[in-house]
Amino acid sequence: MGTTSSQSKTLYQKLYDAHIVHEAPNETPLLYIDRHLVHEVTSPQAFDGLRAMGRPVRQPGKTFATMDHNVSTQTKDINASGEMARIQMQELIKNCAEFGVSLYDLNHPFQGIVHVIGPEQGMTLPGMTIVCGDSHTATHGAFGSLAFGIGTSEVEHVLATQTLKQGRAKTMRIEVNGTVGAGITAKDIVLAIIGKTGSAGGTGHVVEFCGSAIEALSMEGRMTLCNMAIEMGAKAGLVAPDDTTFAYLKGRQFAPTGEQWEQGVAYWRTLKSDADAQFDTIVTLDAADIAPQVTWGTNPGQVIAVNQIIPAPESFSDPVERASAEKALAYMDLRPGIKLTEVAIDKVFIGSCTNSRIEDLRAAAAIAQGRKVAKGVQAIVVPGSGPVKAQAEAEGLDKIFIAAGFEWRLPGCSMCLAMNNDRLEPGERCASTSNRNFEGRQGRGGRTHLVSPAMAAAAAVSGHFADVRELSAATH
């Protein structure tokens, strides 16, 4: 699959081949893992497995842990999110101390969402293999690293051996050419891509995003893009590293320095697909065609531009898609033929490993400034990490949000998933900057619409979905 001549390779193939430890006929190749990120939910059983067998963590210096999934965003009290959360966090503290793993706990200034702190601290570097017991590990692919989520038994295997059995994936190139219009962000680009491919369009593939619109994105934007590669069914997402990547990484805590930095950059510049490399699948989009996106259904592929009408199930020729649309509209309590700008919301969530970085908060604050959250709407802003929160506060973004009636919270995964106190009640409708709109994802019976941070802020101040391009053009 994805075979090319021995000379020409895709970026994915270069990364994969560079990490093969052992390969034999009829066996899944064994890959070396450069970085293992750990959080409180998928690690307790893995550490218990090591303990039962009397095994150490093989490379504690390449293993980093944080608390994020079930932490409270209102207090740093470990007891605040309930008994199960408390046990998981206490187990993580105990396990990291026992096995010598660095832990960014609730009181650490760098604590935050695992996929925010990895890049922020320079743990994530181009050319690496990176795993975490979390499906959105694909985020780190923005740096030209092969990053993917693993299950708890695989977490144990990596802790014990620093390796993982991993078959070769197919390759897909997604090219977004041209320039996006005003107000269009990486979130809109990736939702438009998933709208085109469908939520299973990337199944079995590792996706490389390229084209002038991708090259123009900041690292934050590229992380948003790769974060949601998983939402089109892909194993991982990649963007080739370039000067934007190197400028972001330089001087970060775990980034190399001096001569090692120069050597690193020289190697990282080779991490790109060869000009004649063959991809199994190629998808192209014109950036100029992309409008602000809003999901209407219960998977990220059920998405439309904010100025389009909600589709009727009978407009889908595929019977599976038609049935899925019918079920989604019933769950979401929406009618075909209307625009989402006519649909009122109850809650707004700005945060998650998709959109909780400084650039995201700036975009939301620009819309919130001088406006007020609509009556009856609860809007929360959850920075992705301690450093993001500190930077936002240094720039006065917290004051803008609070003045507009948003709640300014502590870092964590928050309302992205119903594993802490931030969740939807049955029937509540939320404009969310997170990555999944499945049934019950944000709370049993909750209705999730995925949007960009600016679109979420626009919905908060309007009380319904709104076209951010009209709002930002209007005078406050």
From Swiss-Prot:
Keyword terms, alphabetized: 4Fe-4S, Amino-acid biosynthesis, Branched-chain amino acid biosynthesis, Iron, Iron-sulfur, Leucine biosynthesis, Lyase, Metal-binding
SS bond partners: none
EC assignment: 4.2.1.33
Binding site for [4Fe-4S] cluster: C353, C413, C416
GO biological process: L-leucine biosynthetic process
Subunit structure: Heterodimer of LeuC and LeuD.
Official protein name in the record: 3-isopropylmalate dehydratase large subunit
Gene this protein is translated from: leuC
